[in-house]
Amino acid sequence: MKGLWLPFLLVGLTTWAAPPGVPLCERPHVAAPAVERPFPEEVQRALDALVRAELAREPNHAGLAVGVLRGGERWVGAYGQRDVARGLPATPRTTWRMASITKSFTAVAVLQLVEQGRIELDADIRTVVPAWPEKRWPVTVRQLLGHLGGVTNYGRFGPSHDSGPVDSAGALALVAGYELEAEPGTRFLYSTWAYNLLGAAIEAVSGQSYGEYLQEHVFGPAGMEHAALDDRRTRDEHHAAGYRLRDGQRVPSKVIDVSGRFAGGGTRASIEDLLGFGGALLDYRLVSRTSTGWMQTPMSTRDGRLTDYGMGFATWPLRGHYVVAHSGAQPETSTLLLLLPGEDVAIALASNVEGQAASLKRIAYGIIELLLEDKGPRLSAHRQGTVDAVVNEGLNRVFGYGLAYHQWAAHGPGTLPGTGGLPEAFEQVTRLLDRAAIERAPDAARERLLAAHEPHEDWLLVRVGAHMARTLEEAMGPERLRSYPARGPLAFFNDYLAVCESKSCPDPFRFNETLRADLRRFTGENIEPSRH
């Protein structure tokens, strides 16, 4: 079937939402009412064309589902076949293995219990799960949520244990005998088995099985009608058959049982369900705004280096957008849930072919560009040599981290990090971008720039860039910020410096004349030198 795409189904559906701005403690966990509307027809056509273009580029998908939620607008598309041998089409009702997106469900469940005072984030996990044997170091709930607990993962030192069903006690026993790979807090070690420990904590505290707890407190309130633990014995005719690629051809996936990964990778859901989960997080219907912010804040190792992972979600800046996401990869499936909390967007994707992470990410990034990035001329840097390249990379990182964190903190649940004074931060960033210093040791200068967003550097690039974004939004309005992902970092800096001139910003918020001269040379634009 390579090169030939199968029949598709495109559906515009209503969405679920809850009254904005109401904290969790002021309302019960209930399913959101049906409201909202489809995207305008021209946007639906554009979304469909974008997905089709990726399918033409990557014809290995058998079935694919894509869902998009932006504020009060919703779109779901389903393409290809959920079961090639039987000729069954993929639909919005099709259920897919969620794989590691299950970790996001588990993190929500844990934080619900934290909000109720039934679990403490910084408690030793053994206070909740005494069946976990004592190790060389204690491991906290917080560290497990952020993959900082040093717990090994299946497959690293032993088999995956996926040949037959096990209960939660059996799943916990799979990892109990292994020593920690690292002292907790010192090293990021992605671990499905760490999330099994959290699943055991949910069961111990709630008195319910993990699956029962999710149904009552996560799936139900989010309107996830078809979500469940992925027990092969309870699958219905709507579940997608899985495939893998062998010598460029699709063949059926290896049959595995995922009960041994229950809280780290053992669920299934439809694309509507996954999109509903994303919407419930954006609306703070599952956990409070504060807890949502914790989930979306990247943790750091003890020496102050970011892991780019919060509690149940990875985070990163993308062209000035603050991305919160989790992917899933298992036999039978490739999945991705991507949230932009500062812009009220959720994107959900699922394929029943393994190894499609890059394809799903291309679709998601294309949707972001389509929906959120105003088209405009991009200011390209006219640069020469290594020093110019390092300066330009620094400008891009100030812009990317700063705009992303500003959007997340100003329009989402985030809190800007860092404790130092802003004038000092601007002075330090100016020194990092100093041509003379870069020319003396370009490799060392670039290395310092690449670390300057980290906690051990007091989040310098984040704090300076976020202040610039806030200044621009106050002076030019929020719509102006939407232009920068397309127009680029030079436009961001040029506009900021122009605003600073008009407002007579005090030094050192103007950077210095050397950097301003670089910007003039990079863009050819006439930026007036500082009057100070």
Predicted regions and their residues:
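Sec-dependent signal peptide recognition
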Residues: 2-8
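Catalytic loop of the DD-peptidase/beta-lactamase superfamily, centered on the K-T-G motif
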Residues: 18-78, 203-208, 212-216, 220, ...
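Surface-exposed patches in mature extracellular/periplasmic domains of secreted proteins
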Residues: 59-67, 157, 228-230, 290, ...
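Pan-zinc metallopeptidase signature
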Residues: 414-532
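Active-site-proximal loop and beta-strand segments within enzyme catalytic domains
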Residues: 30, 45, 56-58, 70, ...
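Secretory-pathway/luminal and periplasmic proteins that interact with or process carbohydrate-rich
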Residues: 75-77, 132-140, 150-156, 211, ...
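Zinc-dependent metallopeptidase catalytic helix centered on the HExxH motif
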Residues: 377-420
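N-terminal signal peptide c-region/cleavage motif recognized by signal peptidases
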Residues: 12-17
